[in-house]
Each structure stands twice: as C-alpha cells, then as structure tokens.
Amino acid sequence: MTTVETAVGTTQSMVLNMGPQHPSTHGVLRVLLELEGENVIRAVPDIGYLHTGIEKSCEDKTYSQAITLTDRMDYLNPLGNNLVYCLAVEKLLGLEVPKRAQYIRVMLVELQRISSHLVWLGTHALDMGAMSLMLYCFREREEILKIFERFAGQRMMTSYIRIGGLALEPPAGWREHVKRFLDMMPPRIDEYEALLTKNPIWQGRLKGVGYISAEDLIALGTTGPGLRAAGVAFDNRKAFPYSSYEEFAFNVPTRTESDCYARYLVRVAEMRESVKIARQAMEKISDEGLIKTEAPGIIPPEREKMKTEMEALIYHFKIFTEGFSPPPGEAFVAVESPRGELGCFIASDGSPKPLRVHFRSPSFINLQALPKMVEGQLIADTVACIGTIDIVLGEVDR
C-alpha cells in the first residue's frame, strides 16, 4: 500500500480512518489503517489538510517581511524557525552577528525547546490516560511564555530574532525572571519522572512498542530524538555548531532500545540539557553591547540615530519599503529543532525578494517512520507511536 487510493481492505481486513479529526493525531493528520482484528497490518499517513503555502508566500515578501511567516510554520518552535531563516539570510549576506545577540538567541531557543517538549509530554501523557501531567506541563510552559512576552511583547509568534541580530534590547529584570525559571525547572522534571518513568502502566503502554531500527531511521532521513533513541548521537548543535553552540558544555542524550519508551526518556533528558545550556547562555550575556550588527541599508538603524541623522532616516525608509538585495547565490543552514534537523534553503537572484525558499521540516520526514513503527502493533499502540514521533502539522504541510 503506497498511496491513499490503494489503501483498500480485503475480505479478511478492514480499513479504518484515524483522523483527520482524531484528538490523538495532534492536528489534522489522517492515517489509513488496514486491520486484521486489532492488529495493524498496513498504515498510510495522509497529509495536506493544513497546507498554508508558507514557502511560496515567503517568495512574495521581502527578506525581512518573511520572518513573520516562519513563526507560523512549527507553531511550537517559532523562535527556532526565526533562527534558521535568519541564519540562512545572514549566510547569504555574509553578516556576522554580535556575540551578545548570539547568546541571547541560544538562551531563548533552548527555552523554546523546553516549552515544545512540555507540550509534547503533556499531550502524549494525556493520550495515554495520564491527565495530571497535562496540567503540570502547561503550568511550567506558562512561565516560559511569560518570559517570551517580556522579551518580545508576544507570547508565541514573537518574530524576536531578526536578520543580523534581535528585534529589541532585553527588558529590565529579565535575568532574575529567567534564573527563577531555570532554578524551578529541574525539580519539576523530577516530579514528572516520579509520576511516569517507573509507573508500570506507563511502561506497559510504551516499552517494546513502536520499535524501528537505526538503519531504517537513517534510510528514511529521520533526525531528532527518535534517531537518538536508536543509539545515533547526531545533534546539529554538536555536529555543525551555529550561534556559538561550540562554547557550551552539554551532552547529547541517547538510548538504544528505539521504542516509544526510549523516545520518551530521550526527550525528558533533553529538557535537563536545555536547562544547562540556557543557564550557561544567561551567564555569558553581558548587560551592555550590541544586539544587532551594523550594516547600513540592510539592518534598520537605531531610532535615536533617526532623530539626528538624515542618512539613518533614509535607510530606515528604504529597508521597510523596498527591502535589501543580497547578491545572487544560494545558502543552506540547518539547526536542531525540538523535532530534529530543521533546514532552510534560500536562493537569491539579486532582487529584494527571495527566488526560492525551502524548509527541510523534521516533522514531515519523521512522519515517514510511522508505518514501520505501527505495522504489526495493536491499534491502540498507533496512538503511542504518533505521540512519540512528536509531529506538528503546521510544519508537515507548511
């Protein structure tokens, strides 16, 4: 069964539609399941219900205008989307971002990673019947969103990371707010693990379920926690450091079991590592310094300069009305999102609008592993497998 059209049952089997409105698909994913009794013999994911045309829309905007579209792709990782897009444009322009801005970027995207994993853990636990975790995880996520609101004035679609640096200077009192959260988070993760990790019901639902070999994952191009749960310690922050990640000390959590339980353990361990990275970044951020590089005609000037310098006023007007024109060429950058390798390819023809924008979205590629995970499993285990892949349909369809 390779297409939706060929997913028809025989007299011995039944075809069941799971989704696109099923709550456990976490969006509008439709999965056609061919069943023999309660056993899944074939599965076909059917995507496209949330197609928004973000890539094509980016090609109709100037380079700066397209940033706001990237927020809405993986809506649980908007800062990560901003980052990969801005890094690609900066590579195209040959811009060097100030260290202070790089450290702030790292701190915020690691908080975003924790926030994304909290949504995953809460919703996955709810799918498995553990309602309390949903409430606890969203309690902690709320604190992260308050930090984002303090920095950017917006809780989710922040557009805070900009080409050449950041949109705004960090607000007064941010350091105490972030430190308070980072001090609070490790005991809360201990609390989650006390409820789940050794719980026999939780283990019974996840252990040995959804196994897929490392060879199959590599062949499919899968990345992220799913690949690391199969024993492959690949993480773009270590393999191809960006935004000064080479200056940070952290581990890449791995397991070897490659089942749903291993994927759960890897993500929980990743939250602990993100707390470490965010704390190191916070300590590296100085109270004074540049938050964006100085590049007249590309980076908007400071508002104070616009009051006294005519050139700054002209640059500001031209950047926001006409945009800037990178030299013709191509750039590709990959970062480590909460779901795996998130890449951005941009082709420039020398005009103020990109010729082509393409995102390598990890959710889209990781979803290919679902049939191999669920075939031969019980239908109830399909819910567990979808949960541990951790897909975001806005990124799958984009």
Residue ranges: model-predicted function:
Residues 1-398:
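Metal/cofactor-centered catalytic core regions of large enzymes
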